[in-house]
Amino acid sequence: MELGLVGLGKMGGNMRERIRRAGHTVIGYDRNPDVADVHSLEELVGKLKGPRVVWVMVPAGAATQSTIDELAELLSPGDVVVDGGNSRWTDDEKHAVELGLKGIGFVDCGVSGGVWGLENGYALMYGGDAENVAKVQPVFDALKPEGEFGSVHAGKVGAGHFAKMVHNGIEYAMMQAYAEGWELLEKVDSVTDVREVFRSWQEGTVIRSWLLDLAVNALDEDEHLDRLRGFAADSGEGRWTVEAAIDNAVPLPAITASLFARFASRQDDSPQMKMIAALRNQFGGHAVESKK
């Protein structure tokens, strides 16, 4: 089949290559002319035969909204837009309504796989009407990992991005658990080879995982992570997961704590701990440390 792909960055560029390897035609557009196949969205749409499928792989928020707005004016009834970026699931219904007024279908798709997806395939979670999903199915089949699993029609519009959001929340908590275990192992004198302890966990243990494999890779490159600063950004999906939990009265202690740990990583000196130190001094005369 033919596919229009908007956004050819680290993810989009590799996705274009994987889809082409499966025998499909991909016409890609990106603001960077060095990687684009066409010079504009209008040219991209013009090169596709109807019913068209256009996959949007640009940053969430304003960039996605402006791309969908432009496609709404260029596409025809029966065409389908897929949002494969990390959009907030609450935006999906809005996009579906906007496009639906012009007879254009909409599918949201959460994509996981990162820079490894080109060779290993991408895990896909998508939401939308069955009729629209069917038009995109050959692309889903090309992108997914080999085998029975790795993709799912999660439900109606918004379900794909919601599932990906929860996936990322779980990822936050798993990474935090590995990080806490690593720090404790590094702290004690009795454990003399933390890296090899992590490596030993890769086979036969209940905590083996791809994230653990990546942790071992990182320790092979920098055994004590001395070259790194302890600073971790958050993409936004961890926050959205916690907000969704609040909205639905679902307890999420591990994921919430992992998000707050990232906030703490950005502080050179904790204002909260200053207040706690001051209070301990006030009520108990406990010693405080002054700035040097």
Placement of each model-derived feature along the sequence:
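Helical "substrate-binding/catalytic lid" subdomain
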Residues: 125, 135, 158-286
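NAD(P)+-binding Rossmann beta1-loop-alpha1 motif at the extreme N-terminus of oxidoreductases
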Residues: 1-52, 78, 115-117, 281
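Rossmann-fold dinucleotide-binding core
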Residues: 67-69, 88-188
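Rossmann-like NAD(P)-binding element
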Residues: 31-94, 100, 118-128
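Hydrophobic beta-strand scaffold residues
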Residues: 26, 106-107, 252
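Conserved dinucleotide-binding and phosphotransfer motif residues
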Residues: 22, 102, 248
